[in-house]
Amino acid sequence: MDTTPASRGQWPVGIMSSVINVFASGKSCNSGGAPRSSVRRGHRAGAARDKSRGFDAPPRRPKGGVHPATTSKDPNKDIRGPPAPTPHKKYRGPAIPGEGRSGVHTTRPRRRAGRSGGMDPRQLVAQPQQRWAKTEIPTERRAEIDGLLPSLLNTLDGQIQGDAALLRYCVGAIKRELRRRWESVQPAHHVAASSGKPSPQLFNEAAQNAEDLSGDGKGCAGQSVQQEVLHSGSGVPPVCADCGKPAANKW
């Protein structure tokens, strides 16, 4: 028969205290959850990884002790000073002047004079004289032109060939206009030349032209006595081809 304390149900004091400590430690582990394993599982296992509770190292800094973003690329920056600020873009305002101002037109500030001459840009520049301004023709020159036109018209009238009724009508109209001017202006042979004496050329041409334009075409020099009556439509009256006067209709 065993007579040891364990057989009698009595445990030594040291053994009992160790058993109690083991039981207490196991209970604390069960209350905190599953016991942690020293072996790390893979990411595919789905278990939470043990994070190292080591000391977080501060971010590395360059050896110079200054962040590279704060260093100046231009060594002369401190000498020249800070850069000038960028000017603010002015607002142009509405496209139509005075729009959105409730009908109040403010005075526009006076512009500064430009570099060239210091003249106000609003000052009007003198316009050059017009070269095509109307000029008065001297009486002597007008008489000379009137003396040359009838002979030119007679030459043109003699060169007209074929059915050119409209051209003949225009020539006759010019001759009639010359006749009216001869009646209102003094004859060319009465006009003195620049030297103060009548010009013989003007006198001869005036006498010949007066003979050509007088009468009803019967005294035309170098032209046939027969009158040619022209018709160029209902709106144009019949005109004599030689003297330019309206002629009676023979039809």
Curated annotation (Swiss-Prot):
Question: What is one term from the GO cellular component aspect held by the record?
Answer: host cell nucleolus
Q: Report the outcome of residue 153 to A.
A: Increases nucleoplasmic accumulation
**Motif range (Nuclear export signal):** 149-153
Family annotation (InterPro entries): Umbravirus_LDM
Motif Nuclear localization signal extends across 108-122
Q: Name one GO biological process term.
A: transport of virus in host, cell to cell
- MF annotations from Gene Ontology: RNA binding
Keyword Ribonucleoprotein in record: yes
Where is this protein found? Host cytoplasm; Host nucleus, Host nucleolus
Residues of the region (Disordered) are 25-134
Q: Which UniProt keywords apply?
A: Host cytoplasm, Host nucleus, Host-virus interaction, Ribonucleoprotein, RNA-binding, Transport, Viral movement protein
Q: Keyword check for Cell inner membrane, yes or no.
A: no
Described function: Protects and provides long-distance movement to viral RNA. Self associates and binds viral RNA and fibrillarin to form filamentous ribonucleoproteins (RNPs) protected from RNase. ORF3 protein actually fulfills functions that are usually provided by capsid protein, which is absent from umbraviruses' genome.
Complex formation: Homooligomer. Interacts with host FIB2; this interaction, is required for ORF3 protein transiting through host Cajal body and nucleolus, relocalization of fibrillarin to the cytoplasm, and in presence of viral RNA, leads to the formation of stable RNPs.
Name of the protein described by the UniProt record: Long-distance movement protein
- Species of the source: Groundnut rosette virus (strain MC1) (GRV)
